[in-house]
Amino acid sequence: MLGWRPDIAELKRLVRPNTKLICINNASNPIGTVLDADTLGQIAEIARSVGAYVLCDEVYLPLENTEAFMSMADVYEKAIVTNSVSKTYSTPAARVGWVVADEEISNRIRTYRDYTMICGGVFNDALATYVLEHKDKILERNRKIVFGNRDIAQAWIDTQHRVSWTAPQGVSTSFIQLDIPEDDEEFCKRLLVERGVLLVPGSRFELPCGVRLGYCASEDVLREGLRLLGKALAEFDR
């Protein structure tokens, strides 16, 4: 990774003539970085050179510069894009998502879905439809939460010499790097038991240098969680 972005030269090296699929996510989970149109175009060209599909999970649609966000479906003819109302639209209980793909792949997905699910719940579909019909109001609300809480997290990080991050680009997930002399999983377990703060160990993302921080809780919960995390980190300086 280069600044938490894909190494295009490395991707070229890894792709082979028999490569069938390249998997990415945009925005990144857990980092919160967003791939720009140029990077997506380079990935598409690499995939096109071997006839591979690109599967891109776009469930973390950024709330910053949303209008300028480029979907892989708009860049590459063999893109398979997944999304849902769970993250950016804050409605995980609906359990409703969608796939954008070419006709062949779409037909295969529909056939598979007929065998595994037949249909979604009527109330789930109604809830998801309502959310998308009123998405502007929902996104306006969520932007206030994401931008305000990101500022709170940044201010806290600025006071912590053991913590750093690449600030998420309007995405509701983030990753903080921790300079601590303890295994990340052990630290997270101890933090949960001793202080009631739940973080996802970076090793679960093959990134053992830190933890995933969900910073879009209510302001008082976020501030208290960061305070307790700061106390736990301060113990390493005793």
Where are these regions (language model features)?
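A generic structural signal for well-ordered alpha-helical segments
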Residues: 47, 157-158, 191-192
